[in-house]
């Protein structure tokens, strides 16, 4: 029941190198996944080339998916690492019930001896619940998330994924831009192939006012996660920075992509509602607003237009939130 990974390098000409990779399963070598890419040589081996890093991440995701796809009942699992991977899949479903299931899985993984990653993802999970404004969150959510961050950092302070998750949590719950910058920089240095690390650094730069650099970093995160089953997350990360750097059409396209792959992910719906209104597409704005209201019962066009606490801050900073046009379809 083992998996076999094969990687082959080849030359197409003097300046180009290609990589082929495949994952086989069992004695028969049944194909699970295959991929290939090529890049230009510029002296040193192209280990940091975005296409090659992306191919490596796709291979890792394919292996992880193959190991979990046949599992139908998580209650039978006694492997902490496998439980953590299943929980991460549930987290990126982004539905309230899926996040609750993921939290239970991660708690069990901790009881089975999981590393700091389980604590970090439990903190990240609560961050998502907070931003998504889920109805089932408790008043102690921020404090619980902070304790989980402390636990994760004490146990594995040099784990790139732990640092990225803690960076995100510190930024959103504590508004600590400096901490997010430092943690995400170290996360990137420890693993430059980690898209969550680049995404965290992009978000830190965004809130630090370095918008153009934030967008470049978000583009990098999206590119190296190309083909990921969680692509909607990276698409929306780039949507944020596109909006803040005045790239309205790009932001709309990215939000549409994120919504297509995760219809119940609320932030793309919020941004599409506002961006369609600003682009003089009132019918589309109204349609997105109606979808959002089914997921977020206290949503209103008026609140989006005038409530500073409503979670679309980058749109307000960018000037792309046209309150008059948003309100034009209110009621």
Q: For each predicted feature, which ranges?
A:
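Alpha-helical segment of the N-proximal tetratricopeptide repeat
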Residues: 79-112, 128, 132, 165
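Short coil turns that delineate tetratricopeptide repeat
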Residues: 111-114, 154-157, 192, 226-229, ...
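Catalytic-center loop of serine/cysteine hydrolases
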Residues: 1-88, 92, 97
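Structural signature of tandem alpha-helical TPR/SEL1-like repeats
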Residues: 98-104, 135-150, 173-186, 208-220, ...
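Residue at a conserved register position within TPR or TPR-like alpha-solenoid repeats
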Residues: 90, 126, 170-171, 205, ...
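TPR alpha-solenoid repeat register
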Residues: 116-119, 162, 197, 231-234, ...
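"A position-specific structural signal for the A-helix of alpha-solenoid helical repeats
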Residues: 85-89, 121, 128, 165, ...
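Canonical positions in the second alpha-helix
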Residues: 108-109, 151-152, 186-187, 220-224, ...
């Amino acid at each position: 029941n083992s998996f076999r990974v094969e990687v082959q390098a080849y030359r197409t000409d003097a300046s180009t190198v290609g990589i082929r990779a495949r994952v086989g399963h069992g004695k028969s070598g049944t194909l699970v996944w295959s991929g290939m890419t090529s890049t230009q040589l510029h002296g040193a081996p192209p280990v940091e080339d975005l296409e090659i890093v992306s191919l490596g991440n796709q291979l890792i995701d394919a292996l992880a998916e193959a190991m979990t796809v046949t599992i139908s009942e998580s209650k039978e699992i006694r492997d902490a690492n496998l439980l953590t991977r299943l929980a991460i899949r549930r987290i990126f479903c982004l539905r309230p019930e899926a996040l609750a299931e993921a939290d239970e899985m991660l708690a069990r993984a901790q009881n089975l001896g999981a590393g700091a990653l389980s604590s970090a993802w439990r903190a990240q999970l609560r961050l998502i619940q907070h931003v998504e404004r889920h109805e089932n969150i408790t008043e102690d959510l921020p404090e619980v998330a902070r304790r989980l961050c402390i636990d994760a950092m004490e146990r594995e302070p040099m784990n790139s994924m732990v640092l990225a998750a803690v960076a995100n949590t510190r930024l959103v719950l504590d508004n600590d831009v400096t901490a997010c910058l430092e943690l995400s920089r170290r996360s990137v240095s420890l693993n430059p192939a980690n898209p969550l690390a680049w995404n965290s650094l992009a978000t830190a730069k965004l809130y630090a006012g370095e918008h153009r650099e934030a967008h470049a970093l978000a583009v990098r995160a999206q590119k190296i996660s190309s083909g990921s089953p969680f692509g909607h997350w990276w698409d929306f990360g780039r949507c944020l920075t596109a909006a803040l750097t005045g790239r309205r059409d790009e932001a709309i396209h990215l939000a549409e992509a994120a919504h297509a792959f995760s219809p119940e992910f609320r932030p793309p719906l919020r941004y599409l509602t506002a961006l369609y209104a600003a682009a003089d597409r009132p019918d589309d704005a109204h349609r997105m607003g109606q979808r959002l209201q089914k997921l977020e019962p206290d949503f209103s066009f008026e609140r989006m237009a005038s409530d500073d606490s409503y979670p679309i801050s980058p749109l307000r900073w960018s000037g792309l939130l046209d309150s008059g046009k948003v309100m034009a379809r209110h009621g």
